[in-house]
Amino acid sequence: MLLSSRIFLNAQPDTPSSMKNLLLKLCTVALVAMSTAAANVQAADLHVMSSGGFTAAYKLLGPRFASATGNTLDTALGPSMGKSPEAIPNRLERGEPADVVIMVGYALDDLIKEGKIIPGSRVELADSRIGMVVREGAAKPDIGSVEALRQALLHAKSIAYSDSASGVYIERELFKRLGIEDQVKPKAKMIPRIPVASVVANGDYEIGFQQVSELLPIKGATYVGKIPESLQSVTRYAAGIPIGAQHPKEAKALIDYLASPEAQPEVKSTGLDSVTMH
């Protein structure tokens, strides 16, 4: 208002050119003010990288966050580790933009140590356990005990497991712990990039193992259950903000929402277990 008053005091209302200059100045002031206001409320375009285990929960919760905040979410999916181009560490190495990464906790810790994630930005999201599927319509073997799981693996004609943390555990530890590594390895295969349940659903493999949250969404496969707790490998999922994130404030808001008590019903509905401490 002070600027406008000065303009009026210096103007000569009786001169057409003075009035024209006055109007131009007022229009300029208004346009600058409008542009500034628009910039302040402009929604952020958040780039999110998410690995498989938390993806189902993220797909439920992400749109709610976007609707509530006006921000948009540009999402890239990929495993937390491995050699595939889609793996989150490889995406970051190539310089793909990211404001949020959601991945296996220990893989996130590796990125923090490498200086790629902001220290202190890690937030715990959920725990994931390993489960098994068969093709829809097939008999469901008993896997409720250690011995039952052992027999199910021995009698299966073919076994599939993922190329993520759960699959690495199955290949390197579970078979050994059950004492059947030599018998089952020739018929077992790690499945890269695609959901394990999908290759069971189409009949390529008789049984498949992956984190429960990654098994449940796939049509054509029947979820049998979790492997016994004494044999479980619990995978912790966490989120962090990469160094160089364009929207760190909005990224933190998204992460806090995913970890909030309000989000837990959706998190649990996807087969994940809530983390009691954040």
Where are the model-predicted features located?
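Exported/periplasmic ABC-transporter solute-binding proteins
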Residues: 41-86, 90-97, 106-114, 119, ...
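Phosphate-/polyanion-interacting regions in eukaryotic proteins
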Residues: 102
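Intrinsic low-complexity/disordered segments
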Residues: 9-13, 39, 44
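N-terminal secretory signal peptides that target proteins for export/translocation
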Residues: 1-22
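Bacterial N-terminal signal peptides
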Residues: 25-36
